[in-house]
Amino acid sequence: MGKRIISQNRGKGTPTYRAPSHRYRADIKHIKFSGDLVRGIVEDIMHDPARTAPVALVRLENGEKQYVLATEGTYIGQEIACGPAAEIQPGNTLPLASIPEGMPICNIESKPGHGGQFARASGVYGILVAHDVGATVVQLPSGEMKWLNPNCLATIGVVAGGGRTEKPLVKAGKSFYKYRSKAVKWPRVRGVAMNAVDHPFGGGGRQHPGRPKTVSRGTPPGRKVGSIAARRTGKR
């Protein structure tokens, strides 16, 4: 009898496969404001294991502290503002209705009050394309055009940490630490490279599945590997 395969262990949710969320800084949201404006001072810029971009610790006028996404050019001691009356400069957060067309923006809300869902990875940004009646057109980093509520908040500028993907990992140790901060088991071993006890495709004198790779939708756990409920296989 074989052992439980990796997909079964992942489904159970053992510590090996859980995201280390206890190490994450905070859930990054936009600064809440009452009225037209709230200001704050950037006290620190630090790494967050939860994301690829650096985060900035901001002390607000009322003494509270909050983490926000750092934009390119952010520095310690910088004053940032949030609200409809904020200045049009990188790092400030305004409703889409208050931002001029053609401006690069990041940390864009999908709905008012949701805190920011689009363009949050390092080095990315969206473009505010046009203002329409009751809607604002924003081009996302993927190129998709999105019609959003003009009251949705967005931060002006480009998310800091650009060029991250241009630096090669070079060695496996770097990749190990990269994936350690995520809910990903790394390295990922192929089933045909395993022993027969570890995977349905394992074992044998050479690396081949030894059986059809297609399985039905109702296949029990431990055997449900390969092309699941495939309509077709092979090259098109």
From Swiss-Prot:
It comes from the Archaea. One of its GO terms (biological process) is cytoplasmic translation. Disulfide bonds: none annotated. Keywords: Ribonucleoprotein, Ribosomal protein, RNA-binding, rRNA-binding. GO terms for molecular function: rRNA binding; structural constituent of ribosome. One of the primary rRNA binding proteins. Required for association of the 30S and 50S subunits to form the 70S ribosome, for tRNA binding and peptide bond formation. It has been suggested to have peptidyltransferase activity; this is somewhat controversial. Makes several contacts with the 16S rRNA in the 70S ribosome. This is Large ribosomal subunit protein uL2. The lineage of its organism: Archaea, Methanobacteriati, Methanobacteriota, Stenosarchaea group, Methanomicrobia. The gene is rpl2.
